């Protein structure tokens, strides 16, 4: 069964309507999961800080399930991800209240806090207060663009999986996901960015819904995400103090992978340029140096990305370090 949000409030002062929304859903005793910087949006509700929760405490989840009738995640990626985990374990509906828009986790059923990520349930409702989101750090909002443009290469990888591996593919989910990315790219390239936060949130919610339709992360996560996870692995391996965000890394990965698809003749060069220019338009990094990684790390990440998880992509069985360098140079990442 496909579960997608029943309600989406995406407007200025939307958070003020949260009590009304809960009443409409007949939810009387929610538990809020939030952070210390976002607890101010939890007034009137019982709350727990996300970093005080043991996500492996099954007994605790059962207790929450008995005491509360719903879970609300208020904040960025971690409170919302942990809210999904608790919702999934306690069998209670989840309401997503993002305070920024850096990735499509605000609406998707994917829990990415743990690796490998896994499918839980989509939020029953999303309350996105544009006044709050507009005031969030610009770095987070530009990262959101990176997560959206990645739908372009993710869908190409999914189509490749269908062609080369006879993988199950959903036309509706694939088209929906790709269209969301194309529309946001066209917006940031052709209009002023006054409405960018609202457009971005709508796109991220749509991307999350495409995942729910497919019951897979395939429409929004391909080789560009493998590259991002490979960068994360290297940050851990070498204990690097690089403050790069998931969406920023995925945006850079999308530039790289779109170059590879251009060279295979599956997209035109105009698409590659649009991806890069849309990221530039929102001040997202488009080179490894701006992201904080040197050439050797980028080459190691790209040549090892195919090992991150078992998923057929244009990386296939992997790139040599020589080929990785060539692609990085052609895409002007290094």
UniProtKB/Swiss-Prot annotation:
Substrate binds at residues 104, 147, 229. It is an enzyme of class 1 (oxidoreductase). Pathway: Membrane lipid metabolism; glycerophospholipid metabolism. It is found in: Cytoplasm. It catalyses: sn-glycerol 1-phosphate + NAD(+) = dihydroxyacetone phosphate + NADH + H(+); sn-glycerol 1-phosphate + NADP(+) = dihydroxyacetone phosphate + NADPH + H(+). InterPro entries: G1P_dehydrogenase_arc (IPR023002), G1PDH (IPR032837), Glycerol_DH (IPR016205). Disulfide bonds: none annotated. Keywords: Cytoplasm, Lipid biosynthesis, Lipid metabolism, Metal-binding, NAD, NADP, Oxidoreductase, Phospholipid biosynthesis, Phospholipid metabolism, Zinc. One of its GO terms (cellular component) is cytoplasm. NAD(+) binds at residues 77-81, 99-102, 108. Binds 1 zinc ion per subunit. The keyword Zinc applies. One of its GO terms (molecular function) is glycerol-1-phosphate dehydrogenase (NAD+) activity. Pfam families: Fe-ADH_2. Its main location: cytoplasm. One of its GO terms (biological process) is phospholipid biosynthetic process. It comes from the Archaea. Its cofactor is Zn(2+). Zn(2+) binds at residues 147, 225, 246. Its EC number is 1.1.1.261. Catalyzes the NAD(P)H-dependent reduction of dihydroxyacetonephosphate (DHAP or glycerone phosphate) to glycerol 1-phosphate (G1P). The G1P thus generated is used as the glycerophosphate backbone of phospholipids in the cellular membranes of Archaea. Belongs to the glycerol-1-phosphate dehydrogenase family. This is Glycerol-1-phosphate dehydrogenase [NAD(P)+].
């Amino acid at each position: 069964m496909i579960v997608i949000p029943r309600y989406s409030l995406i407007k200025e002062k939307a958070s003020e309507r949260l009590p009304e929304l809960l009443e409409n859903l007949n939810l009387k005793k929610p538990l809020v999961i939030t952070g210390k910087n976002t607890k101010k949006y939890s007034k009137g509700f019982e709350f727990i800080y996300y970093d005080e929760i043991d996500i492996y405490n099954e007994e605790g989840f059962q207790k929450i399930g008995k005491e509360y009738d719903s879970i609300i995640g208020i904040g960025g990626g971690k409170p919302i991800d942990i809210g999904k985990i608790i919702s999934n374990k306690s069998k209670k509906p989840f309401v997503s209240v993002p305070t920024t828009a850096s990735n499509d986790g605000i609406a998707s059923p994917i829990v990415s806090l743990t690796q490998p990520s896994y499918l839980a349930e989509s939020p029953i409702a999303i309350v996105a207060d544009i006044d709050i989101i507009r005031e969030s750090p610009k770095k987070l909002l530009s990262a959101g663009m990176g997560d959206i443009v990645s739908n372009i290469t993710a869908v190409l990888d999914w189509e490749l999986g269908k062609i080369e591996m006879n993988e199950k593919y959903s036309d509706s989910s694939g088209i929906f996901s790709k269209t969301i990315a194309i529309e946001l790219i066209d917006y940031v390239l052709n209009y002023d960015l006054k409405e960018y936060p609202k457009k971005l949130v709508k796109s991220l919610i749509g991307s999350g819904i495409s995942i729910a339709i497919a019951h897979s992360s395939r429409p929004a996560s391909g080789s560009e995400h493998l590259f991002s996870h490979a960068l994360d692995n290297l940050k851990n391996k070498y204990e690097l103090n690089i403050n790069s965000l998931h969406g920023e890394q995925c945006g850079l990965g999308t530039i790289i992978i779109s170059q590879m698809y251009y060279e295979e003749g599956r997209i035109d060069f105009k698409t590659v340029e649009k991806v890069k220019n849309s990221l530039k338009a929102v001040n997202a990094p488009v080179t490894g140096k701006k992201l904080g990684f040197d050439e050797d790390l980028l080459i190691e990440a790209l040549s090892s990305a195919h090992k991150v998880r078992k998923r057929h992509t244009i990386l296939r069985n992997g790139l040599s370090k020589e080929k990785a360098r060539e692609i990085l140079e052609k895409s002007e990442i290094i």
